[in-house]
Amino acid sequence: CGRVGLVAHALNWRLGSDELTQIIENGQPKVIITQGQFSEIARDLQGKINFIDHWLEYGSDSNSSFDILIEEASSSEPIVPKNIGDNDPFFILYTGGTTGISKGALHTHKSAYFGMLNQTVAERIVPSDVYMLTGQMFHIPVLLAMNYTSHGCPIVLMNFDAELALNLIQEE
């Protein structure tokens, strides 16, 4: 997203339709991509929100619109706009903070870079590390995973299962 000037805007799958509507209306995204298992709430949101240009789905229980888009996409690298700067938006994360009402925290390319640099130093990341992402993909763990990926580290994605996690840690 960031390389071509798009702003990533992940949504918390645990929220209800009204909360998601508020977040979407606040962030004003142009495209929403959902997994097939969330198609029911996506249809509900489509009935409430009229400014989204594209609603895409992926996965086995979906209309495959995202999968089709990817299959038909060019294999060449996208043209990188020259006007994307350090202080331009990169991603927005929503948090209930102290009030319980979702508020967007907009991160720039620069804030993401320095956050990743801080993590790299603090965790001493090296390419032989393996990152197990068990946190929420709609919040900061996804940025942490991007940092490990940028160092060439493999990422393990999983729904948290204590026994499975311990077995994976022991194997690695």
For the regions a language model picked out, list residue spans one by one.
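Short loop/turn segments at beta->alpha junctions
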Residues: 16-19, 108, 161
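Conserved AMP-binding A3 loop
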Residues: 90-114
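Structural core segment of the AMP-binding/adenylate-forming
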Residues: 3-71
